[in-house]
Design a protein with these regions (language model features):
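Conserved structural elements of the adenylate-forming
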Residues: 51-58, 171-174, 185, 204-225, ...
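Conserved AMP-binding/adenylate-forming core of the ANL superfamily
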Residues: 35-65, 69-86, 103-108, 161, ...
């Protein structure tokens, strides 16, 4: 018999019994038997122990550099971004994922509204964006940008070894007590901003309960298991990328495969084939790219058991084109940032 809530009334009570997402992640990481926690399509794999070590090391650096509550993050889907996200949440701070595609005015406005003093980012990422004509460093006159590469260089070999041993030897309860700050499930965990296409970007505050409940709902409805491999290609400034393809699998002990560019469908399909990816979530615009790309083959997509579209209306030509080429249906999710983000999804007939 299922122990999961089955009614609306049950879901009114159940979320209060959940752990914050970073605590759920910690417990899963200590128990997980999967080969890796996070990988990128180029082949760099991070084990659960190394991921935990990274979170513990990085959280200490954030404590030293950023005493304020709201912490900015300017990164694409990546292992470093996932580690930084969990580290920030574990400190009881509010994570502000900034939309690096929104333009200078919208980004500056978002950082100012959220009173972000420090933004953690990557020199490699900033250089790539500069090549595309975006000088992101000039977008934040009132915030200081801190580079992950510089922070890594500051961490001694001894600190890495000692922290790795703690990650391996200490039980989850002791790590939580030693490193994590106590939070209320009603505290604001994250602020996600709209794109600003209809005026100034609007910040949406999501509590720990919002995120934990929606992640658990998604895991239940998608029947996600640690035998799955989730393709994490949506950016974490997007609610679906943040909650459904990053935090949900991490909290459930499900491996994720990251790629920074959701439009790079040929590389992503190669990653699906390489890692036997089982769940792909994307916007209809991105899914259409799989159907029209000659580099994305039928064979490369056959490990997938579930493809879900969200963020915009799934047009019949996209759904039919995907099913015709890959012989698999596309299911449609609906939600908004305010619903953390998932509100509904259609599922396979049972």
């Amino acid at each position: 018999m299922s122990t999961h809530p089955t009614s609306f009334a049950d879901w009114q009570v159940y979320p209060s019994k959940l752990d914050p997402i970073h605590v759920a992640w910690l417990k899963s990481a200590k128990k997980s038997k999967t080969a890796f926690a996070v990988a990128d399509i180029e082949g760099v794999e991070i084990s659960h122990k190394k991921f935990l070590t990274g979170v513990l090391l990085f959280s200490k650096k954030i404590e030293a550099y950023s005493p304020e509550q709201n912490i900015g993050l300017l990164l694409p889907s990546s292992g470093g971004g996932a580690i930084a996200s969990i580290a920030i949440l574990s400190l009881g701070k509010t994570l502000v994922n900034l939309n690096f595609t929104a333009g200078k005015k919208a980004l500056s406005s978002a950082a100012k509204q959220a009173e972000v003093k420090h933004i953690y980012t990557s020199r490699k990422f900033l250089d790539k964006m500069f090549e595309r004509g975006m000088d992101l460093e000039s977008y934040f006159p009132d915030s200081k940008l801190l580079m992950l590469e510089d922070i890594r260089e500051e961490i001694s070999t001894l600190s890495r070894i000692v922290t790795l041993l703690k990650a391996i030897l200490l039980p989850a309860s002791m790590i939580q007590k030693s490193y994590f700050k106590e939070v209320s499930m009603n505290d604001t965990a994250a602020i996600l901003f709209s794109s600003g296409s209809e005026g100034s970007p609007k910040g949406v505050e999501l509590t720990h309960m919002n995120i934990a409940a929606n992640a658990k709902q998604a895991a239940i409805e998608l029947e996600a298991a640690d035998s799955d491999v989730i393709m994490s290609t949506l950016p974490t400034f997007h609610a679906f990328g943040f909650a459904i393809t990053t935090l949900m699998p991490l909290s459930e002990g499900i491996p994720i495969v990251c790629h920074a560019d959701p439009k790079d469908v040929s590389t992503i399909s190669s990653g699906i084939q390489k890692y036997s990816g089982t769940i792909l979530v994307g916007t209809p615009t991105f899914l259409r790219m799989y159907t029209i790309s000659k580099k994305v083959t039928y064979e490369s997509m056959q490990s997938l058991r579930l493809v879900v579209a969200g963020a915009e209306k799934l047009r019949s030509e996209v759904r039919d084109g995907f099913e015709k080429k890959f012989k698999m249906p596309v299911y449609e999710g609906y939600g908004t940032t305010e619903t953390s983000p998932g509100a509904s999804v259609n599922l396979p007939d049972i």
